[in-house]
């Protein structure tokens, strides 16, 4: 039987996941993180993107995170997300439209374009589309 630890993924709105997992993958402030049983204690910011949860027995779940905090303690990992949305709850058409609009803003020749905000919106839309894609593959 594979080693596991307890994971809680919560947002301001609701608890998204609580249970035993074999590992998770998430994007921290310094890059990609893989958290396995026995990981050293850690507290880090999470960048907007996804969390890949490998549950007990290898089943996978993907959740979009708009950012937040990851805390790793012995046998327990907590993700406090600003916003968390399950892959199956994301709207693909809305994410595609947001991506298109962000790309238009970036390529716009107007001087009043906020590139940082447009880039953040583009990254958010791309991350949501990736979560949708991976969720479909896992089903």
Swiss-Prot record:
GO cellular component terms listed in the entry, alphabetical order: plasma membrane; proton-transporting ATP synthase complex
Location(s) in or outside the cell: Cell inner membrane
Membrane topology: Peripheral membrane protein
CDD domains: F1-ATPase_delta
Swiss-Prot/TrEMBL keywords: ATP synthesis, Cell inner membrane, Cell membrane, CF(1), Hydrogen ion transport, Ion transport, Membrane, Transport
Entry-linked InterPro entries: ATP_F1_dsu/esu_C_sf, ATP_synth_F1_dsu/esu, ATP_synth_F1_dsu/esu_N, ATP_synth_F1_esu_C, ATPsynth_dsu/esu_N
GO MF term set: ATP binding; proton-transporting ATP synthase activity, rotational mechanism
A Pfam family that the UniProt record links to this protein: ATP-synt_DE_N
Subunit structure comment from the entry: F-type ATPases have 2 components, CF(1) - the catalytic core - and CF(0) - the membrane proton channel. CF(1) has five subunits: alpha(3), beta(3), gamma(1), delta(1), epsilon(1). CF(0) has three main subunits: a, b and c.
Reported function: Produces ATP from ADP in the presence of a proton gradient across the membrane.
Family note: Belongs to the ATPase epsilon chain family.
Classification via NCBIfam families: ATP_synt_epsi, PRK00571.1-4
PANTHER family for the chain: ATP SYNTHASE DELTA/EPSILON CHAIN, ATP SYNTHASE EPSILON CHAIN, CHLOROPLASTIC
Protein name in the entry: ATP synthase epsilon chain
């Amino acid at each position: 039987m594979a080693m596991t630890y307890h994971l809680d993924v919560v947002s301001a709105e609701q608890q998204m996941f609580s249970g035993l997992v074999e590992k998770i993958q998430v994007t921290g402030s310094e890059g990609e993180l893989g958290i396995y049983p026995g990981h050293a204690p850690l507290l880090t910011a999470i960048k907007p993107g996804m969390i890949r949860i490998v549950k007990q027995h290898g089943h996978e779940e993907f959740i979009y995170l708009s950012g937040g905090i990851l805390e790793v303690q012995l046998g327990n990992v907590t993700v406090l997300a600003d916003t968390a949305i399950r892959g199956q709850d994301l709207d693909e058409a809305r994410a595609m439209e947001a991506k298109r609009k962000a790309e238009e803003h970036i390529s716009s020749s107007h001087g009043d374009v906020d590139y940082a905000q447009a880039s953040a919106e583009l990254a958010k839309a791309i991350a949501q589309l990736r979560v949708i894609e991976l969720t479909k593959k896992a089903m």
